[in-house]
């Protein structure tokens, strides 16, 4: 399901996960997303870890809180949250077990204590 959102600054509408507004270029207010959406990846198990790493460094360079230190308090806060979420998402996707768990959650499945999928 694609999330519909509104930019906190210019009020333009957008769909899906984006770090920045395409209209006013401000960092977006964080919205609920999963690790795959954070990186713009398809929800599938097989991923290119080298590309993931390169994309991680590229995105962190754009959203790192140090780049927002002299901007509004909203932008500074949003960059801190995005940066933290991206760090967590990167760790999830690097690890095969946590990546599998993230996929199962996305598809509405869980693994119980007896290792059966429900």
Q: Which functions belong to the PLM regions below?
A:
Residues 36, 71, 101-105:
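Residue-level detector of alpha-helical recognition elements and their boundaries
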Residues 38-43, 54-77, 89-95:
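The canonical J-domain HPD catalytic loop and its flanking helix-turn segment that engages Hsp70
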Residues 79, 83-86, 116:
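Hydrophobic alpha-helical segments and helix-packing faces
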Residues 3-63:
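N-terminal J-domain/J-like co-chaperone modules of DnaJ/Hsp40 proteins
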Residues 38, 44, 104-118:
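Post-J-domain flank of DnaJ/Hsp40 co-chaperones
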């Amino acid at each position: 399901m694609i999330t519909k959102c509104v930019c906190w600054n210019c009020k333009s509408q957008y769909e899906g996960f984006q770090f920045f507004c395409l209209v006013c270029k401000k960092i977006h207010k964080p919205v609920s997303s999963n690790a795959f959406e954070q990186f713009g990846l398809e929800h599938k198990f097989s991923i290119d870890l080298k590309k993931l790493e390169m994309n991680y460094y590229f995105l962190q360079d754009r959203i790192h809180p140090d780049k927002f230190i002299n901007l509004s308090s909203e932008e500074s806060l949003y960059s801190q949250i995005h940066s933290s979420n991206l760090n967590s998402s990167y760790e999830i996707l690097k690890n095969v077990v946590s990546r599998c768990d993230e996929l199962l959650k996305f598809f509405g499945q869980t693994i119980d204590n007896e290792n059966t999928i429900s």
